[in-house]
A protein has these predicted regions:
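Glycoside hydrolase catalytic-domain context in secreted enzymes
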Residues: 1-818, 833-837, 841, 932, ...
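Short loop/turn segments at connectors of secondary-structure elements within structured domains
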Residues: 115, 167, 689, 766-770, ...
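A glycine-anchored, Pro-Gly-centered beta-turn/N-cap motif
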Residues: 465, 476, 533, 543, ...
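Extracytoplasmic
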Residues: 525, 832, 841, 851-1015
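A general secondary-structure signal for short beta-strands and their flanking turns/coil
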Residues: 751-755, 769, 804-806, 830, ...
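Terminal connector regions
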Residues: 813-855
Length: 1015
């Protein structure tokens, strides 16, 4: 930023109101300056002496200030907390607010180093985790909108601070909305009906804006019901007009995607215009591209200056509240200093957050906690404790994490807590390669070459065919050259041992091995098979590796010859781990994931199964040692099931045998600088675990619908609707003591407020935290309701043995509402509601029923227009863009029939006809059913056109004008109703069956007026 400030103008005058300062700004900006200011990049108004200050930056779990993308150069260190999925597992809103406060404080300090840049951060992510295969699972807060809303609100409150006039660091929620698929996220459509939208997908945003006070929202790349996220009018109509949101931005590059990927518009000018009118204030594409698009939009008449003014007013209002334009600083956050960065206090919050995020999933025979006398020197052949597994002694960087001042691996944490050296075996095989018969080695400059004595590599199997290889001799990872190709074309595709860790936007340390003759090499293959087989090896982009004449190895850029590789296992890593486990009394088996491999931004998981190499470790380690603690360091749930027989002797699912043998299991997310310390303190009882799962750990892949299916209700997703068996349910977590729940009491405290209280007693022998959870079960009603729904939770701290804590909640009855597709509004239905309290969503220790007053569902008046997307049920349907403020119903697969169902319909006594408002280009067939009475309502399209007279008295002669083919139009198609019994007219079920190319907006029933076409 090189703009020279001029603080003499009224814009810098803090004695004026925000609106007065903004009025002056808009009155004095030129049109060209306004067009430049549509970019979120922060355009300097040099003529007015007003620096732009960009809006952007990340803060998912602390400030991301690596500075590897923004041109600032050297990283700024910051405190790194657990990934959001981990922070949320603490179920501690007060602590997460403190973590947010540390994040906001450090963002403010770091911004002071960079002329105020980075005070509006794109965090937190509040997209619902409806599917554990989502690649960005780590960034979110769980599968429940209430938990997400409470936890993310706390983080936002901490980030933004509590000053009534100034914001410490502005929080921008991601990604509005229906963003839960990475593969194809730039063009796919999220089909979301009104119930899913209002009850689930909008809820985290509503809660974190209205309760947490989030300043901004970032739109999603994907389409929502046919409309690209950056063009979604709900940004204005819902987020701003209803929730009170201040500011909205598009995701990085989202403007260009509309034309280049969605092909929704042909020009960026159209996108800028539509986005601004939809309520998006800033485009996060290249500033020069945004300016060109805005300039063209204005010249074409697509944009008016008032559209620009509205956007600029929102953007600069936020910047004023950040204190960026005070003539004399009045913001309390400007008093923060370098001492507030990575301070002792911040580290204390980091350790506490990491500890509270740990979830104890199993503790048979009270294996945990370990005691200090169970540690011996590593030189002791009959040692007491060892650690094995691929996550034993490693700390992986994630994309949205910052650079902390230190990082603690699990092994380092154990050694820090115990003061002893802990023997370790990662369990990786060591292998050597031959390419076209020649040994593969690492040259002095790191290049991978052939012809020298072969080098050994650690083979790391991450599942789904993803491998990394680390040189045993140099410690560097193999990587495939991608960048600097323009200046150094010789680097493109070059394979070298040059990376310290798998990390970058494109993780070029990933390789794939394909057996010649078909198949992928898996870690379950025997050594003999590996030694005897030949392979094609390819890089992250599936470019096959080949030896060049100069003996170097490259990834081929085009269809070139692939070298034939052989791989020989020189050391069996599993055997080494097993031998270590066999000679120690207790073993910690550290398993999990690397946040840059297999699941990340742009990459979804293909399976929830634990990689076979890790399953193999579990099998063999637990076979030789009966005291195994498994520590999962991962940001998403795994499954580890096998076929077998249930207790009744019938075929069923069983936990894999090795997992069953493990006596204790802990789960921790990655990302915290104190991850290893927190785990070690928990293992040795210096901290008592009380975290809870925030998403379901399913048993099998086939329990999950298509990842592209966004219907949580019909798809039976999440704990709210899934009725099958799971490994661990939502809200589950054990402690080192026992707790009982009793005496649930319920009462109405007014017409729309429930008061609930119950007792929680520590019946064990250890002091511990406990997360008290309260759920509601909805009465049977005309539509599917949640099987259970979280309505209250509280983390109780340091509950002593024998102590009883009274837990109270005040629950607005609106928490029990659902979207009524008949009235088109949220409704709390009158009825008997069951409430239960316990330690998870599956634990009903104390329960009670309360009658809650409310509304009674009505009937559908078919004389009024019925929106097609307000159905009660459907098959093979996708929602897409409509018109007239309505969403269109189309077929997901045009080669199959589809239908929508409307129950509780009332037909007028005289209704004899119906009208369908639809559009069809290639032709469709629609059947209309009232009960079991059926009529063919329409067959054809709305593109064919035959001219007709305006009035039947003035008809054209037949043949005066031939039929023509035009673009399809929205048309109301009239049809006759089937004969319906009188009693069926009072409570009918209407089904509309569709075939072909159709977009249906609505229907209504009526009796035609015979005189309607007369003067």
């Amino acid at each position: 930023m090189s703009c020279k400030e001029d603080r003499s103008t009224p814009f810098w005058d803090t004695s004026l109101s925000e609106n007065e300062r903004l009025d002056w700004l808009l009155e004095n900006m030129t049109l060209d300056e306004k067009l430049h200011s549509v970019s979120s990049g922060g355009y300097d108004l040099e003529r007015l002496g007003i620096p732009g200050h960009n809006l952007g930056g990340e803060a998912a779990h602390g400030v991301e200030a690596r500075n590897d993308q923004n041109g600032f150069g050297k990283p700024d260190i910051s405190t790194s907390f657990p990934q959001p999925i981990g922070m949320s597992a603490s179920w501690d809103t007060e602590l997460i607010e403190e973590a947010g406060r540390v994040t906001g404080t450090e963002a403010r300090v770091i911004a002071g180093r960079h002329n105020g840049q980075g005070l509006s951060r794109w965090a937190p992510t509040v997209d619902l985790e409806r599917d554990p295969r989502w690649g960005r699972n780590e960034e979110d807060y769980g599968e429940d909108p209430f938990l997400t809303g409470e936890m993310a609100s706390a983080y936002v409150k901490g980030m933004q601070g509590d000053d009534p006039n100034y914001i410490c660091c502005a929080a921008t929620l991601k990604h509005f909305y229906g963003n839960n698929t990475e593969d194809g996220r730039g063009w796919k459509n999220s089909s979301i009906d009104p119930r899913n939208r209002n009850e689930l997908y909008l809820e985290p945003f509503r809660r974190v804006i209205t309760k947490g006070g989030a300043s901004g929202v970032m739109t999603a790349y994907n389409r929502i019901n046919g409309v690209p996220g950056i063009l979604n009018p709900e940004v204005q109509t819902i987020l701003k007009d209803q929730y009170g949101l201040l500011h909205a931005v598009g995701d990085g590059g989202a403007m260009a995607l509309v034309a280049n990927v969605h092909h929704y518009f042909g020009m960026n000018a159209e996108t800028v215009s539509a986005a601004l009118k939809a309520g998006v204030d800033g485009m996060s594409d290249r500033p020069d591209q945004v300016y060109s698009a805005a300039r063209e939009a204005y010249e074409l008449g697509l944009l008016k200056e008032e559209d620009l003014d509205r956007s600029i007013r929102n953007t600069y209002r936020l910047k004023i509240r950040l204190g960026l334009y005070d003539r004399k600083s009045r913001s309390p956050y400007d008093r923060l200093t370098e001492k507030d960065l990575c301070s002792d206090h911040n580290r204390m919050i980091s350790v506490k957050t990491a500890e509270e995020s740990i979830v104890l999933l199993r503790n048979d025979d009270h294996l945990l906690p370990f005691s200090a006398n169970e540690i011996s020197d590593a030189a002791d052949d009959e040692g007491k404790l060892a650690i094995v597994g691929p996550l034993s002694d490693v700390w992986y960087q994630d994309w949205y994490g910052g650079i902390p001042s230190y990082r603690k691996t699990l092994r380092q944490g154990l050694e820090e807590v115990t003061g002893k050296s802990i023997p370790c075996a990662e369990g990786y095989d060591r292998v050597i390669f031959r390419a076209d018969g020649q040994p593969v080695a690492v040259d002095d400059d790191g290049s991978l070459i052939v012809g020298k004595e072969p080098d050994e590599f650690y083979r790391m199997d991450w599942g789904s065919g993803n491998y990394t290889f680390r040189s045993v001799r140099t410690g560097k990872f193999l990587t495939s050259g991608l960048y600097d190709a323009s200046e150094h074309p010789e680097r493109l595709g070059k394979i070298s041992a040059a990376a310290d860790s798998p990390f970058d936007w494109f993780v070029m340390e990933i390789f794939h091995l394909e057996k010649n003759g078909g198949g992928t090499s898996g870690s379950g293959s025997s050594h003999k098979e590996n030694e005897g087989g030949t392979f094609t090896i390819s890089d992250r982009f599936r470019r096959p590796l080949a030896v060049r004449p100069d003996h170097t190895i490259y990834a081929q850029q085009k269809d070139g010859r692939a070298s034939v590789f052989t791989m020989e296992v020189t050391a069996d890593g599993t055997k080494e781990a097993v031998n270590l486990a066999r000679t120690h009394k207790k073993v910690i088996l550290a398993l999990g994931s690397c946040p840059m491999i297999g699941a990340k931004e742009e990459i979804d998981r293909k399976t929830i199964m634990l990689p076979s190499s890790q399953q193999k470790l579990i099998d063999q380690v637990t076979e030789v040692n009966e005291n195994v603690l498994i520590v999962f360091i991962t940001n998403y749930p795994y499954s580890f099931m096998e076929g077998g027989k249930t207790a009744s002797g019938l075929p069923g699912d069983l936990l894999q045998e090795g997992v069953r043998r493990a006596k204790a299991i802990l789960w921790s997310a990655s990302g915290s600088q104190d991850m290893g310390t927190a785990l070690a303190r928990t293992i040795f009882g210096l901290s008592a675990p009380a975290g809870r799962t925030n998403e379901t750990w399913y048993k099998r892949d086939d329990q999950l619908p298509d990842i592209n299916d966004y219907d949580i209700i019909k798809g039976r997703r999440t704990y709210r609707y899934f009725d099958g068996e799971v490994i661990w349910p939502f809200g589950f977590g054990l402690t080192y003591t026992d707790f009982t729940y009793r005496n649930l009491s319920l009462a109405m405290a007014g017409p729309s407020l429930v008061e609930a209280s119950f007792e929680v007693t520590n019946t064990g022998s250890a002091v511990s935290d406990e997360v008290a959870e309260l759920y509601a079960v909805m009465p049977r009603t005309r539509v599917p309701r949640p099987l259970r729904q979280l309505v209250g939770f509280r983390r109780l701290h340091d509950v002593r043995p024998g102590e009883t804590v009274q837990v109270r909640f005040r629950i607005p009855t609106a928490e029990l509402s659902y979207y009524d597709t008949i009235s088109g509004s949220m409704m709390t239905e009158e009825g008997d509601y069951l409430f239960f309290a316990g330690r998870s969503s599956a634990d009903r220790q104390t329960q009670k029923v309360l009658h809650i007053p409310g509304a009674v569902p009505g009937k559908r008046d078919t004389a009024c227009r019925i929106r097609a997307d307000h159905y009660d049920d459907y098959e093979n349907i996708e929602l897409t863009e409509g018109r007239f403020g309505m969403t269109a119903v189309s077929l997901r697969d045009e080669n199959k029939k589809g239908e929508i169902v409307f129950r509780d319909c009332v037909l007028g006594d005289e209704a004899t006809h119906g009208k369908l408002l639809l559009k069809s280009k290639r032709g469709c067939r629609i059947q209309f059913l009232v009960g079991d009475k059926e009529v063919l309502a329409f067959r054809g399209d709305t593109a064919s056109y035959v001219a007709s007279a305006s009035f039947r008295e003035n008809s054209l002669n037949e043949g005066d004008r031939a039929p023509e083919r035009w673009p399809a139009v929205w048309d109301e198609i009239e049809f006759s109703l089937p004969d319906v019994k009188e009693e069926d007219r009072k409570n009918a079920t209407i089904t509309i069956r569709m075939e072909g190319d159709v977009k249906l907006l609505s229907f209504r029933l009526f009796r035609p007026d015979p005189d309607a076409h007369r003067f």
